[in-house]
Amino acid sequence: MTVEVEAVTMAKEEQPEEEEVIEKLVEKITGLAAAIGKLPSLSPSPEVNALFTELVMTCIPPSSVDVEQLGAEAQDMRGRLIRLCADAEGHLEAHYSDVLAAHDNPLDHLALFPYFNNYIQLAQLEYALLARHLPAAPPPSRLAFLGSGPLPLSSLVLAARHLPAASFHNYDICADANRRASRLVRADRDLSARMAFHTSDVAHVTTDLAAYDVVFLAALVGMAAEEKARMVEHLGKHMAPGAALVVRSAHGARGFLYPVVDPEEIRRGGFDVLAVHHPEGEVINSVIIARKPPVAAPALEGGDAHAHGHGAVVSRPCQRCEMEARAHQKMEDMSAMEKLPSS
C-alpha cells in the first residue's frame, strides 16, 4: 500500500515537471518560427541554414509533447512553421538539384546534399518494414512516389540500393521540379530507363494508380489533416487490391516539422494498417505501412473465404525493424557502391 502511494506521489510530482519541459520546448520553437518567418528569403544561406539546423536539433530528441493537443495559438504557429519548412525544403532541394546537374554524372555526387545520409537510412527502414510486414509478397516491380520534388532521393536510393529491377513513377504537381529531377538520371542508362516523371495533381490520377505494387505518399503532400485524409481516401478508391501504401508522418516534437498522420485516417481511407514506426535517430519521419485489402477469394465448398478486415494491429516502434534495416544496409551496400556512390 505504501509503495502504491509513493508511486502516485512521484507521478504527480513528475507531471508538472514534464509540463514545464513541454512549455519551454514550445516557447523555443515559437521563437525560432518567428525568426524564420522574418527571413527575406528561404533560399539556402548561412542564416537560413543556421536557423533550420537549430530548429531540427530542437525537434529531434524524443519528446512526450502531443502536438495535436496544443492550444489554438500554438497550433496556428505550428501550421505556419510546417509551411515554412516545406518552402525551405523545396528551395534546398532545387538548389542542390542544380548543383548536381552541373556534373557529368550527377548520381556520383549525391553525397553533396547535406541530408543524403538521412535518405539512405529512411529508404532502408521503409524497405525493411515492407519486407517484414509483407513477407509473402513478391518484390514490387512498379512503385509510385507521390510528391517526389526536384531531388527525388527516396526513389533514387530505393531503385539503386534495394529494388534494382523495379520501375519508379515519380509524381509532382510542379513541372519545374520534374524537369530538374529528370536531369539527374539522364546520364545513368539503368536508372533513366526505370525512372518516369509525371507532372500531375495526384487527386486527378485514377486508373494509373491501380498499376503500382507500392505507393509512397510524401510527408508534405496534403499538409492539412483534412487534405491528407482526402488524399488517402482517393488512393483507397483507385489503388489495386493488395497494393501497399507507405505514408510518412511525424511523432512528438517532430510534428512541428512535418504533418502528423493519424493511423485511423488510413483505416478510414480503406486500408489495413500493418505497422507504425517512430524512429528515434537522425531519421525525422515516422513511417506507416498499410495495405489495401486483397479481393476476397471465392468461398470453397463447405467453407468460408478468408478476407482482410480493417482492424489490423498497429505495431509499436521496435528495435527489430532498425536491426533488420541495418542488416539490409550492410548486405546491400557492397553491391550498391558501383551504382550509387555515397562519397
From Swiss-Prot:
GO terms for biological process: nicotianamine biosynthetic process. Induction: By iron deficiency in roots. Down-regulated in chlorotic leaves by iron deficiency. InterPro entries: Nicotian_synth (IPR004298), SAM-dependent_MTases_sf (IPR029063). Transmembrane segments: none annotated. Its EC number is 2.5.1.43. It catalyses: 3 S-adenosyl-L-methionine = nicotianamine + 3 S-methyl-5'-thioadenosine + 3 H(+). Keywords: S-adenosyl-L-methionine, Transferase. It holds the Pfam family NAS. The keyword Transferase applies. The keyword Transferase applies. Expressed in leaves. PROSITE patterns: NAS. SUPFAM superfamilies: S-adenosyl-L-methionine-dependent methyltransferases. One of its GO terms (molecular function) is nicotianamine synthase activity. Coiled coil: none annotated. Gene3D superfamilies: Vaccinia Virus protein VP39. Belongs to the nicotianamine synthase (NAS)-like family. Synthesizes nicotianamine, a polyamine that is the first intermediate in the synthesis of the phytosiderophores of the mugineic acid type found in gramineae which serve as a sensor for the physiological iron status within the plant, and/or might be involved in the transport of iron. This is Nicotianamine synthase 3. It comes from Oryza sativa subsp. indica (Rice).
